[in-house]
Amino acid sequence: VADVQVIARTQAWHFDPPDLETKATPILLELTNNSDRSIVVRYDHIALTDAAGHRIDVIPPYNVQGTVSVPVTVQQPYYFTSSYTYAPYAYRFSPTYLRSGGGYAGGFAYDPQYYQPYLTVYTDVALPTPEMLQRALNEGPIEPGAAAGGFVYFKKIRRGEQILTLHVDIIDQASGNVMGTANIPFVAH
């Protein structure tokens, strides 16, 4: 589209949740308006089509559904201690300020059967995550000389050697008319 640059990137999601692509297909869109008119970004004017012409609409970021599993870690644990030492095998998990004594020196057996399920804890988190919303492309105007970028989300696309085309309508803000459409082909593999 003349004077409006549209760049689309797949496999650009490197944020939380790290396994988002198992539930949705994020595509990073960057639009630069080099025209002398204000244009508008509208979700209902962004879509993918397959070779058969089937349309896959953008899912507004606040409507992405599903859950992903994320690891849970304690960032700043609180330890109350009074004349306390810790098991020798727990040294690497203990806060730095407790490490000076080297841990309990007596017999203290480690029971791997008990601790195995607790080594890594995962929890289900509902989509969309706060980071998905923060990194989403917002609907709205792009003034002349300005740019906007962010992720748009589609349903999970099955991998295979299918050709998909991303269609982004460039809409004139004043009239609401489509000035043109950027068509960007992709191979889903």
List where the protein language model places each region.
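Short, solvent-exposed loop/turn segments enriched in Ser/Thr/Gly
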Residues: 20-28, 148-149
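Surface-exposed edge beta-strand/loop patches
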Residues: 1, 45-52, 93, 102-189
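Low-complexity, acidic Ser/Thr/Pro/Gly-rich terminal tails and inter-domain linkers that flank the onset
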Residues: 1-22
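A short, sequence-level motif marking secondary-structure junctions
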Residues: 11-14, 62-67, 186-189
